[in-house]
Amino acid sequence: MEGINISYFMNGAAFMFFGYVSFRLLTHRPRSRIQRILGLTLAFWALLEFKDILLYFPSLKTERLVNSLLFIDGWAVAACSFYLLELTAPGWLNWKKVFSLVSPYLAFTIAYLCTFYTPIFPFYFGFILIYSAIIVLIVTFAARRYQRYIRNNYSYSEHIDVAWLKKATFILAICLVTWVYTLSLIHISEP
């Protein structure tokens, strides 16, 4: 089996997984606020996977379109941060905060779409790394604060643990750094 066919399959499987889970989370009643945010985050990831599937068609794969869609890919970092922030500080997230967190991504995207100026990519990738580092720090400290709260307020706290959140955030950070590094190599090697 050719490597490219595995890529098709993986994109399709990821699209179906994210789409199905987001549908289940968003249609399940009663649903909590965290389920709704996770459902919306996964719906966004399903759209990203669908976009990647469309890019397998050669007629759609132009340099400007691919570069434009890379900016939308960066929005996934913000989408994941919404879920992590809501998980560690329930009720903190509202539409005003969502807009303020998304606005830099929106500004970079609009700036690129108006100019198609490719040297903006290193600044965008740098912003994503800084934003992610700040989110990782916030989530790490919030998880510690939550752990302390559980220990101080509950007598049986053995199965109430958010240590997994720190590990998951660390793994996400590694994936993000790898993604940004790979994209920066692609854009640095272009003439």
Residue ranges with predicted function:
Residues 1-110, 114, 123-126:
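N-terminal low-complexity or simple alpha-helical regulatory segments
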Residues 3-14, 112-142, 163, 169-172, ...:
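Extracellular-loop-to-transmembrane junctions of the mid-late helices
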Residues 21-22, 80-83, 133-153, 181:
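Alpha-helical transmembrane segments in multipass membrane proteins, preferentially the mid-helix core
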Residues 56-61, 118, 144-151:
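A cytosolic-side transmembrane-helix exit/cap motif
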Residues 104-105, 166-179:
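Hydrophobic alpha-helical membrane segments
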Residues 147-172:
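Membrane-helix boundary/juxtamembrane motif in polytopic membrane proteins
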Residues 186-191:
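Residue-level detector of conserved catalytic or cofactor/ligand-binding positions
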